[in-house]
Amino acid sequence: NINIIEVDLPLEEEKEDYNKRLENFFSKNSKIHHCITFTSKAHIVGEFLQRTNRRNIQIMGYDMVKKNAECMRRGSISFLIAQHGYMQGYNCVEALFRAIVLKEEINPVNYMPIEFLTRENVDFYQRTQI
């Protein structure tokens, strides 16, 4: 039986506000052992868990940004999904060019690669450029 419980962490809050929200959330939901964040801010939760010595919670986050990588190396983030922002941006501009300038029909589906990073492979990750 899976139960999904959400906590809202607005992107522009102060660290103290995040700490209050997270302390309240994890105190009320002490049986939570897995989290996922859908922004590049997984480090906010990872840093909180490390600071409060909550070691039995796994986090999966998005984006290989410096703070997320640091949390992963320390073990407070378990997994990261790395996306290729440069490639996504390039493909968007190219699709616009082909549609507007060349008047070509554009495929509405454009699958992009992602990479699943762990503590063991994070130091070997090389962000691919165009």
Predicted regions and their residues:
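Flexible loop/hinge segments that line or gate small-molecule binding clefts
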Residues: 65-77
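Hydrophobic/aromatic beta-strand patches that form the interior of the parallel beta-sheet core
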Residues: 36, 60, 79-81, 117
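Hydrophobic alpha-helical
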Residues: 11-67
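Hinge/cleft segment of the Venus flytrap/periplasmic-binding protein
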Residues: 84-130
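Short active-site-adjacent structural elements
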Residues: 44-46, 68-71, 89-90, 125
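Short beta-strand elements at the ligand-binding edges of bilobed clamshell
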Residues: 74-86
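Terminal, non-globular segments
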Residues: 2-4
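Short, solvent-exposed amphipathic alpha-helical segments in soluble enzyme
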Residues: 50-54, 76, 98
